[in-house]
């Protein structure tokens, strides 16, 4: 798609210094490691039976229906699964379709869930991590922090390229590592109807991109086949900070547009070979680091900067984008289309652990004694015509309006965490899910469909399944705990039953035995012109997939916040962390629909305190000592 020979010629003719083209691979060894050694052994994603999905489906919709509605839905499901019914035919087609596929769902899912989605990726799709503070000079110095992020990210990339990174194995089950193929040198690119993924050879594109003052710079990752030293990386970043080039117009804001609008602006940009070459470099880069000029202090300010910033000193189509503010605060944003959060959590955990272990005095000495670097950072030139200038102005205005329409709060509860929760002999994930359901019920008085992401990476090319976290048991739990006349014993009993059911459903979902992906697959098997089975036209079908709460957690001791947007206008996005001594929930919702994030935050505090009090007394009270 992109003319790289032209790109090189443009840069040779520019007034900026040029960087030698690197041709040597990262390593002279052709031996590969174990990163993908389990791939051929991974099972394929199963196709559940009609009967098990139908049974689960009815149980998941029951909390939302009165008896008459439930009987109507049962009749439609029974008609669907009966011998000779539509479900039987669709199931046979799906089984046949799946027979020769690595993963039957992957054939549809990336396009359906991500690539054909036309709303802006930020704030609606991408997710952010806000890194915890580093309590030394590294955490206060923008260039020191950015140097280490770049250095350890390049090191991680080398392990992916030579496959020496250890494959992930959880409780004896190897996980699919396919997503790591799309981690580096990759970008989402706007296209008609459905976006595409543009992937580049990492050994032929040994550079990353730095964004500073809305300008884009190309920085090498290797010299003569060797990773740059920390001192060399620092020197490049320092050069960029000292560059007198005026602040850019904010071309990165174009990536915040609706995808069709971004496509139109993108096609206009491509009319210039200069733009085509520069965009090609950004797309092909290993990753992006944005050096911001702001100084976020509170956890809310840090989260907002990582989630969206001002929308200009960014390039939202890259799957790996790091941010470092002027005061050293850092974070990460992940474009979601080819990778879920678990691979990028591993990346961030790995590099941040190394940053925390770095001795700042040794780092300063190492940088000060570094040999001179071998070239200069290249600024990527852009030819901004009047149409592009107007498009950028329009993108900035729309981005500001979109962000202003969002209401964001942070529930950062230092009262307790998984250390205490485990003493209740319950899954910490189930506990926090019930905490959020209780808070939502106290706030709205309603029980609404709730989504939790369940990883299916134990299967080849597995990504996620829906965890339907609302159940008859969780309904009983929130109703009992909201009843002033309920006894503590009843509260404990309903809590335990709801937690048990939660674990059971999430475990089944992780085993590929959820409801939503199977029903989705069956629906894809309907041929043009065929009647739509009533199970799919039943109002409860769409309602039960309307996520008034969209939730997920990630495992990290190195984040202080993470999050994303709500998925419907009158819903909440709830991203949570469960650390040993604290619980975090990032709350987002749309303004103007009667919901307020600070109100839900208050009910989260209230519910967290109540659950701790009741369960401590009901489950942890020591037996009286014998006389």
Swiss-Prot record:
Q: Which Gene3D superfamilies match?
A: Chloramphenicol acetyltransferase-like domain, Choline/Carnitine o-acyltransferase, domain 2
Q: Where in the cell is it found?
A: Peroxisome; Mitochondrion inner membrane
For the ligand ((R)-carnitine), the binding residues are 451, 453, 464
Q: Which residues form the signal peptide?
A: none
Q: What PROSITE patterns has UniProt attached to this entry? A: ACYLTRANSF_C_1, ACYLTRANSF_C_2
Q: Which SUPFAM superfamilies match?
A: CoA-dependent acyltransferases
Q: What is its EC number?
A: 2.3.1.7
Q: Does the keyword Lipid metabolism apply?
A: yes
Q: Which family does it belong to?
A: Belongs to the carnitine/choline acetyltransferase family.
Name of the protein described by the UniProt record: Carnitine O-acetyltransferase, mitochondrial
